[in-house]
Amino acid sequence: GVADDKSIYPYVPDMIRFYLGEDPLLHNVPTWQCRKPKELAHVLAHLPELVVKETQGSGGYGMLVGPAASREEIELFRERLKARPEAYIAQPTLSLSTCPTFVESGVAPRHIDLRPFVLSAPDRVRLVPGGLTRVALREGSLVVNSSQGGGTKDTWVVEE
């Protein structure tokens, strides 16, 4: 859907203000839209530091994690960006939290991210007390998508 299109991401704070009439409680991750020439220039100059994602992509496919990429991979991605800048966004590489995770070798720390859920009714909007925590099961990986070998954990809020 439209909300899954990564090119919408920079506009989410404005959408919150428009639809909910309030300021966002959390800030967005800085996002450069490669379709904008000045932003593309910034991305090309900082490729080894950034995560670059296809705007229409899903599941962790078609992305570059600059700090983990080889020089060859970075140069290949540079050419892709120049050929189709409108198809990509870029973000800084985030330092994800870790949590103890049961893996083949035992319990070990793995990177995680949280997907909260919001329920909307005609008279109110409600944040679900919990969410889905996505886990990068490969040691050192920042890619939490299940299609790329990631896993999931239920997350519950036990006290407010």
Language-model segments: residues:
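Domain-scale recognition of functional cores that engage charged ligands
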Residues: 1-160
